[in-house]
Amino acid sequence: MDDRYPALQRAQLRLDFIHANSTTHSFLFGALAELLDNARDAGAERLDVFSVDNEKLQGGFMLCFLDDGCGMSPEEASDIIYFGRSKKRLSTLKFIGQYGNGLKSGSMRIGKDFILFTKKEETMTCVFFSQTFCEEESLSEVVVPMPSWLIRTRESVTDDPQKFAMELSIIYKYSPFKTEAELMQQFDVIYGKCGTLLVIYNLKLLLNGEPELDVKTDKEDILMAGALEDFPARWSFRAYTSVLYFNPWMRIFIQAKRVKTKHLCYCLYRPRKYLYVTSSFKGAFKDEVKKAEEAVKIAESILKEAQIKVNQCDRTSLSSAKDVLQRALEDVEAKQKNLKEKQRELKTARTLSLFYGVNVENRSQAGMFIYSNNRLIKMHEKVGSQLKLKSLLGAGVVGIVNIPLEVMEPSHNKQEFLNVQEYNHLLKVMGQYLVQYCKDTGINNRNLTLFCNEFGYQNDIDVEKPLNSFQYQRRQAMGIPFIIQCDLCLKWRVLPSSTNYQEKEFFDIWICANNPNRLENSCHQVECLPSIPLGTMSTISPSKNEKEKQLRESVIKYQNRLAEQQPQPQFIPVDEITVTSTCLTSAHKENTKTQKIRLLGDDLKHESLSSFELSASRRGQKRNIEETDSDVEYISETKIMKKSMEEKMNSQQQRIPVALPENVKLAERSQRSQIANITTVWRAQPTEGCLKNAQAASWEMKRKQSLNFVEECKVLTEDENTSDSDIILVSDKSNTDVSLKQEKKEIPLLNQEKQELCNDVLAMKRSSSLPSWKSLLNVPMEDVNLSSGHIARVSVSGSCKVASSPASSQSTPVKETVRKLKSKLREILLYFFPEHQLPSELEEPALSCELEQCPEQMNKKLKMCFNQIQNTYMVQYEKKIKRKLQSIIYDSNTRGIHNEISLGQCENKRKISEDKLKNLRIKLALLLQKLQLGGPEGDLEQTDTYLEALLKEDNLLFQNNLNKVTIDARHRLPLEKNEKTSEN
C-alpha cells in the first residue's frame, strides 16, 4: 500500500518508530518544552500557547503554539520531517536543540497528529504529519503532504498540480480544517511577516478517557491531569515555564495571559556566587576529540588517493588532479588544526558558576536547578544535608548552575544527562558548596529559626509559606530586588525599593518608560542587573585526627590485601608418597651426648644408622599449549635435618639448628608449629671423609619460558644429641596445616620401611672400605591428575652418600618409580590420543643399565619424548579442541539469533494485546457511564477491583435499567410498525 502516494515526500521513518520515539518523554511538560525550545531557537520574542475547543476530535480540544520567529521556507520545512537532520549543531550560535528530533518526539507525545503552518519571506508552507492518516491508509512508512503557496497571490508554488491537489485532499480529509479557506485562515493567525503556528490534535488520553492535559480546571493555565506532586513546576505548565530558561528573554503567554518568567538567580534572598574550577567533566570533550581524529584519518586517506591520481594521470587531466590534491591538503591541515584545538580544550580546566540563595516565598521548594545551555534539565534536586529528613541545614536553599553543552551533554529528551557518573559528581560538589554557603551567610542550625521568623515563618519547620502580612512582605521586598522585563526591548530592569509593596503585581504590559528610575527609563539604556557577591570555598586541611584515621584505614586495607595474597603451608598426605629409597653407610659409634658435626676436618665417630625417605609431592600445573619449549622441570636439592625419631614420637622439645653444606637452606622451626610434611628422612652419622668427598650430582631440564612450575622448599635443621637421627623436612608455600592424625599415620610407614631395609644395612656394612660415595641420586618423576586432564610436574629432592659398587647403587624402589612414571605417561597419552602410536621410549618394558651409569642420557630421552608430546600430540589435541569450540560458538550464535527473533515476535504480540486491552478499558468505561454506574479513575487494578465489587453486590439499579431498556425496545417495535402501515 506504500506505493499509493509515490509523488509525496516521506519522512524515512517507520510508523512504529514514531510511537517509540514519543515514549522517551516520561515527563509530559518536557515534551511541551521541546516545542518552546524550537520557538526560542527561531528567535521568537513572543510565544502563545493556547487551546481551541473541538468536540469532534479526540480529547475535545486542539493545543496550539504560535510564535513570531523567523519561520521556515519550503526547503527548510522539508528538513524538519526527517529524524536527526538539524543544522543547529553546525551553527556558531548556541541553540538549545541539537538533534533534530524535538518536534517529532514532543508533538507525538502529546497527540497523534499535528499540522504546521509557517511563513517566511514570500512563501507559506503547510506540513501535515499524521499517524491517523498512515493508519487509515495502511501505510507502514510515514507520508507527509507539504503544500506551499505564495503569500501575495495565494497560488501554489509547485509545478505539479496533481501532487498539489492530492496533498490538499489528504489534509481536508484527516485534519480539522476541511476547506482551503480554513487553511488560509490559519496562515492569517500568524500576524507578522514570518512565524509559525503548530496545531496538535487527537490528544493522548488517560485510562478514564480524559486527556492528559487539563485545560478546564484553570482557564489561565495548562495542568497535568491527576498529578499529585508537591512542587508546582511538576503539575502547572505556567510554573514550569517560569523557570524553564536560565536567561529568559522570550515572552511566554499561556491561555492569553503572560507568564511571569523568573531570572532565578535574582529572585533569591542573600544570593552568592561560587566559582568551581574543575577538569573532571571530560566526557563530551573526549567524544569531540574522537570525532576530530576520525575526520583527520578520512582526510588523510583522501589525500593519499589524490596523490596516487596525480602520479598516474595524463597531461590533460593533470591540472584538475592537482587542484583536487591542493584541496585535499587544505582539508587535512584544517582537520589537523581542529584536532589540536579539541585536544587543547580537553586539557583546559573549566569554570562553573554556582549560585545559591534562599527561597523565602516558600522554603519547601528548595533544591538544585541544573540548566544545560540555558535550558532547565533537572529541578528541585536535593543534595548534601537536604537529603536528610527534618534537617535544618540547607532548608529553603536553592542552588543554580548553567552547564555549557560541551562540558556535559544532556540526553535527547533534555530531562537527564548522558554521563550519569559526571552528573552524580556534580551533585556531590554542589552539596559541598551548599554547606559552605550556609557557613558564609550564617544560615545554620543554630540561627535558622530566628532567620525564618524574620520572614513570617513560624517555629514549625513543616510550615511552607510565611504569614501574609505587610510587615513580612516589606521585609521580603527589601531583601529581594524586584526585576521586570520590558515588552519592547526585552531587557530586564530593577524597580526601586520605594515601590508600594502591597500593590506590587505583575503587569501584562510593561515598558522601560514606566520605570521610576530615570537612569533606566529608556529602552536604549544598557541592561543593569544587581550584582551577586562572590563567595570562596574554604580549603581547610584535615585535622591530625582525621589524617591518622585515614592512615589507619589505608594500613588496614593494605594488610588485608597482603593476607589474601599470603601463601599458606600445604600438607602432602602419605598416600602421595611415590618413591622410597635408602642408602647405607658404615661408621664408628660414639655415645657422646654433646656431639657436633664438623665440616672442615675433625675426626668424628658417628653412630651407624642410615635411612632416608624420598617423597614426591605432586602439584597440578596448567599446561600452556601455545608455548613451544619443554614443559618439564627436574629439580633436585638436598635438605637435611637432624632429629630423634624416638623424641618425635614421644614429645616435642626445643631444637638446636645444625650447620649444613652450602646447598642447604637453614631455618628455625618453632615449637608451636605442627607441620608434619616429612618428605625425606636420612638417618646417618657420616665420617669426616664422607662429608669432605660428598658431591651432589643433579640435573634439570628447564623450559625457556615456563611460567608456572617453580617449587621452593624450606629446610629446617635441628640437633639435639648424639643419638638423634637426621630428618629432612620440606614445607611448600601452598601447603595447608598438618593435623596430628596425619602425623600418626606416617610413623608406622617409617617403621615398616626400617624393617625392609635391614638386609641392605648389612650389605652396606660389608662394603664400608670404600672412601666415600661418589654419586648423588636424583630421580625425576611425574605424576598425573587425570581428573583435570592436565600433566602435573613433580620434583623429587634426595641426597645420599654411596659407598657400594655400581651393581648395588641402584635400588629396587628407584626402578619401580621409573616404571610407574612410564606407565603414567602412557596413561596420559592414551587418555588424550588412543588412536596414535606411542613413542618408543615409553614402549620399552624396563630401563637399561644406562640409567645406572649415565642418568643424563636417560634424561635426554625423556626430554625428547616430552618434546614429541608437546609438538605433535598436544598440537593435534589443541586443533581438535578448537574445532569443538568453534562449533559450540556457532551453535550458540545461531540460537541467540533465533531467540532475538522470537523475542521480537513476542514483543509485537504483547503490544497488540496491550492495545486491545486499552481499547477494551475505554469501551468498558463508556459502557458504565451509559448505564449510570459510574466509572473507576485509575489504572487497570482499580478497574478490576471496581468490576469485581460491582458483580458481587446485587445492584438493583443495574437490573432496573436493563428492564427499562428491554421494555422500551418492545414498545417501540409495535409503534414503528403502526406508523409504517399508516404511511402505506
From Swiss-Prot:
GO terms for molecular function: zinc ion binding. SUPFAM superfamilies: ATPase domain of HSP90 chaperone/DNA topoisomerase II/histidine kinase. Keywords: Coiled coil, Developmental protein, Differentiation, Metal-binding, Nucleus, RNA-mediated gene silencing, Spermatogenesis, Zinc, Zinc-finger. Pfam families: HATPase_c_3, Morc6_S5, zf-CW. A zinc finger (CW-type) spans 477-531. Required for spermatogenesis. Essential for de novo DNA methylation and silencing of transposable elements in the male embryonic germ cells. This is MORC family CW-type zinc finger protein 1. It comes from Homo sapiens. The lineage of its organism: Eukaryota, Metazoa, Chordata, Craniata, Vertebrata. The gene is MORC1.
